């Protein structure tokens, strides 16, 4: 299965769980300490990254999704670092800051690619008032399409059953990265993502794939889950659902450097993909591809839609299909770095017909990459009037993404794509019809940047308006 990337900018995901800050100190080792038989590290640089549930939220943001995070922290400097780092990625931080606890922080000392020691600064959050989190969840739920509960057994999910019930009552699916052998506490969740060790801790040792499937389905029945996604390291992943054939995905990892944060990536891509409208099996395929990318990186890592598209389609088909605006800008930068000429056009494309296909083919011939910017439903309605569009945005974009001439499809909500074109600045801007180049939205900006503006003729006899009239008249 090679799924087309969804438009992650349409996905809103609420992350609730154990928030952490990962710190890294890097430096060479050249001698043993005279004080004790340990290496001396000369620290030359350092790095700070969101970890745990914060890494999950960062993964969603890196895809262009809208992440809202609720978690427990202290009133301290690490909490401020997390808020600033996540805020810069447009993650909405809603932390419960407690006086008597430190923000969970893990410091790793690294030398020559090896971790020498890890220092943990933490106290488990215990006996906290569940309303502190529930009230924040209640405010966030109307604005999200999925919920992730990220459990590292640090206390933020002490009242996890209340959180599950709150989300399910709002008809929002709940995805959980579990911790420990007690799956009873996760009863009623939509899907759990245990790794093989976590699975066997609950179900017992398995000797074959058939036995794993049998035990997994039994867990689904016992704890009222809708599904389990068992991550199996070099054996890939297996999606188990009641009444549906098991769906197995082989691993896509080429090299494994570090599995830190891989589970965070799996659940973030899975939940964001479902929130963006993907069915569960396609969302799992995207999560599997994402895991194959991040295990090839050091430490807690995120990935971009460009990297995810390359993992699915190969480097020659980078970011094929529907893409967010932020990811498109990055994809265009990469295309330019390769010396590729980028062509851009736009329109409503409500009912795709032969004239559109011919137009796309001609536009694609002008360069190496073709972007199609598509008016959202609200924009089409303002431009075309009541009754339009006939097809909603996601379907129009999916059809365009299926054309061989088209590389990227991106939505825009304004009446014209002038702002979007100014951000992208294609090598060639193309419009169909009898426009003059100076009349085309975004044309002045493209020309000022050294690009070209071209007008292409539409094929005679092809018109969306005429097709709609023919359908209403019962002809054709």
UniProtKB/Swiss-Prot annotation:
Keywords: ATP-binding, Carbohydrate metabolism, Kinase, Multifunctional enzyme, Nucleotide-binding, Nucleotidyltransferase, Transferase. Transmembrane segments: none annotated. The keyword Nucleotidyltransferase applies. Residues 344-476 are annotated as: Cytidylyltransferase. Pathway: Nucleotide-sugar biosynthesis; ADP-L-glycero-beta-D-manno-heptose biosynthesis; ADP-L-glycero-beta-D-manno-heptose from D-glycero-beta-D-manno-heptose 7-phosphate: step 1/4; Nucleotide-sugar biosynthesis; ADP-L-glycero-beta-D-manno-heptose biosynthesis; ADP-L-glycero-beta-D-manno-heptose from D-glycero-beta-D-manno-heptose 7-phosphate: step 3/4. ATP binds at residues 195-198. Its EC number is 2.7.1.167, 2.7.7.70. One of its GO terms (molecular function) is phosphotransferase activity, alcohol group as acceptor. One of its GO terms (cellular component) is cytosol. GO terms for biological process: ADP-L-glycero-beta-D-manno-heptose biosynthetic process. It catalyses: D-glycero-beta-D-manno-heptose 7-phosphate + ATP = D-glycero-beta-D-manno-heptose 1,7-bisphosphate + ADP + H(+); D-glycero-beta-D-manno-heptose 1-phosphate + ATP + H(+) = ADP-D-glycero-beta-D-manno-heptose + diphosphate. The active site is at residue 264. Residues 1-318 are annotated as: Ribokinase. InterPro entries: Bifunc_HldE (IPR023030), Carboh/pur_kinase_PfkB_CS (IPR002173), Cyt_trans-like (IPR004821), PfkB_dom (IPR011611), RfaE_dom_I (IPR011913), RfaE_dom_II (IPR011914), Ribokinase-like (IPR029056), Rossmann-like_a/b/a_fold (IPR014729). PANTHER family: BIFUNCTIONAL PROTEIN HLDE (PTHR46969:SF1). Catalyzes the ADP transfer from ATP to D-glycero-beta-D-manno-heptose 1-phosphate, yielding ADP-D-glycero-beta-D-manno-heptose. In the N-terminal section; belongs to the carbohydrate kinase PfkB family. In the C-terminal section; belongs to the cytidylyltransferase family. Homodimer. This is Bifunctional protein HldE. The gene is hldE.
